[in-house]
Amino acid sequence: MYVILVYDISGEQGGEKVLNKVFKICKKYLTHIQNSVFEGELSEVQILKLNKELNEWIRKDLDSVILFKSRNNRWMKKEMWGKNDDATDNFI
């Protein structure tokens, strides 16, 4: 399954440590394409593992993670406006 993950981590109450940990977890599973944005192919099992790891760090009252899912990245067309640093083809 093709996924796009975006997160918003608050700087309050030790947010920098949380941000660093969330970034490292996401990097294990997905390709970093922009600040707080990752994309890639994951199985349902990998999505569950990612969710479990992130939930150990995400502070539900301060932080958020959004996961967009698609059966296949062919259903999305990526358009880059401005600086284009990555080598991926498809995006919402």
Regions from the language model: what does each represent?
Residues 34-64, 69-71:
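Short, intrinsically disordered low-complexity segments
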Residues 4, 26, 50, 85-92:
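Unusually extended, aromatic-enriched hydrophobic runs near protein termini
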Residues 1-37, 41, 45-46:
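Extended, hydrophobic alpha-helical segments
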Residues 57-92:
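C-terminal structural segments of small proteins and small subunits
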Residues 24-25, 51-56, 77-78:
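Intrinsically disordered, low-complexity boundary segments flanking structured domains
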